Amino acid sequence: MNIQALLSEKVSQAMIAAGAPADCEPQVRQSAKVQFGDYQANGMMAVAKKLGMAPRQLAEQVLTHLDLSGIASKVEIAGPGFINIFLEPAFLAEQVQQALASDRLGVSQPTRQTIVVDYSAPNVAKEMHVGHLRSTIIGDAAVRTLEFLGHHVIRANHVGDWGTQFGMLIAWLEKQQQENAGDMALADLEGFYRDAKKHYDEDEAFAERARNYVVKLQSGDAYFREMWRKLVDITMTQNQITYDRLNVTLTRDDVMGESLYNPMLPGIVADLKAKGLAVESEGATVVFLDEFKNKEGDPMGVIIQKKDGGYLYTTTDIACAKYRYETLHADRVLYYIDSRQHQHLMQAWTIVRKAGYVPDSVPLEHHMFGMMLGKDGKPFKTRAGGTVKLADLLDEALERARRLVAEKNPDMPADELEKLANAVGIGAVKYADLSKNRTTDYIFDWDNMLAFEGNTAPYMQYAYTRVLSVFRKADIDEQALASAPVIISEDREAQLAARLLQFEETLTVVAREGTPHVMCAYLYDVAGLFSGFYEHCPILSAENDAVRNSRLKLAQLTAKTLKLGLDTLGIETVERM
């Protein structure tokens, strides 16, 4: 149930009846403060201006046409023309019942779309590092949310599996295999890449051989394709271990590497030339874009084919967008790529639109994100100043969580402790990132993310177990509880119920904006409201069975909402902590 959408429709109808244009925006929002009700309609100001009347006068006229019987207990005008809406307790009670009767907690399904989500995108023959964390987990939270809402989601892991470096890597792999050390060398991908690069820089004969190998690989030679495939397979096998540890839904089937688009590139360059979009300039093929200016104020030239015939990332990204629309039949494409790539993507997409490869009706959205910083405010590095490997980061998270869990549960069996430490440690790393607005940089701080206070994974996981503990203590007759009515008579019951019923609205925002921090803030709010409700509205010692059962049902919906909400973020819940 989307109460915001229901109220928007009702207020909109009343505004039109009061003389507003048919496309008027009621601007119904969740109220920021309890005294302003549960919802507030803020659209009178803009519409009144168009109608040449005072906003408060319009609000008064709207109220004469607004029928919220059975939904609102009170509707009032505030300030210059805001309409405050207070929900009817009986309406809240009925909606709580309906939410509990549904596996989806009453969340409706929007029109199903095919949505391609581009995220993670590690490079072949390199280990994943902290720079891959944000794209991987924010993208996966978006995927989980969109799938829960019923969309057909295609995960696209745009792996860096092509380029001139592969001649060097294949030459080095061949050398290692001749020395019977191929498998051992590939066990340490980072070292393998580093050694290959060192030889390439220092040994001219090796470098020449590597350059020849690139040509042979690009011409489709079977032996070189096989060597290339081996490098890709080993990298993706290692990456899959990381994805599984992170509780991320990516699999090998989701790999759509740069190499996938290679066959399309010559045709795209030829087509852009034929359409008069691309021209020859100093031996290269260039698209000049009026939308982007260089330092001199002239249209910026975007190279799509180099003088030597090589293609660029832009060419691949043009092909990629075209493929996602024409072959994958995307209705919407989301890219979880860091903010530094924004101009590059905008240029590629401008060319895509001009060439008619993807119509304007299909959004191409750059859901950019900021950087992960150390406590010093600089990019997160090892003490020695190197890049932090993702596997090392997760190892440390697990070790810190083990100590934390063992401290609180000294008698817990080892296997249970390990399972709990894993949920807490990995959850802490993910939640610390997901709870921040993705567009900003954020400080990575172990102490904050593993704290049991504040908007953290351990606090949210604990809040969930706290709700479950109510049911462990209660001697519950499941059948009697299922048929018991919900009674909302206390303010704290009403506040908790109203917030729980905003779950669908929260999911809708996350799906539209790609902002999982909105879900984190919502769940944290729910946990806080439950805490206040638990303290002031006795559950197990309620004055009678009817009130007890009603409050148990509110607790039940709280537990289900926390679990489902955390699941859309890819955060594991636990039964006890």
UniProtKB/Swiss-Prot annotation:
Give EC number(s), comma-separated: 6.1.1.19
What Gene Ontology biological process does one annotation of this record name?
arginyl-tRNA aminoacylation
Range of residues in the leader sequence:
none
**What broad class describes the main subcellular location of this protein?**
cytoplasm
Pfam hit, one: tRNA-synt_1d
Keyword Cell division in the entry? The reply is no
GO MF term set: arginine-tRNA ligase activity; ATP binding
Which InterPro entries does this one have? aa-tRNA-synth_I_CS, Arg-tRNA-ligase, Arg-tRNA-synth_N, Arg-tRNA-synth_N_sf, ArgRS_core, DALR_anticod-bd, Rossmann-like_a/b/a_fold, tRNAsynth_Ia_anticodon-bd
Give the UniProt entry's GO cellular component terms.
Answer: cytoplasm
> What are the subcellular locations of this protein?
Cytoplasm
Reaction it catalyzes: tRNA(Arg) + L-arginine + ATP = L-arginyl-tRNA(Arg) + AMP + diphosphate
Protein keywords: Aminoacyl-tRNA synthetase, ATP-binding, Cytoplasm, Ligase, Nucleotide-binding, Protein biosynthesis
> Where do we find the motif 'HIGH' region here?
122-132
Could you describe the subunit structure of this protein? Monomer.
Family named by the database record: Belongs to the class-I aminoacyl-tRNA synthetase family.
Kindly give the NCBIfam families that the UniProt entry links to this protein: argS
PANTHER family reported for this sequence:
ARGININE--TRNA LIGASE, CYTOPLASMIC, ARGINYL-TRNA SYNTHETASE
Its protein name is Arginine--tRNA ligase
Give the originating organism.
Salmonella heidelberg (strain SL476)
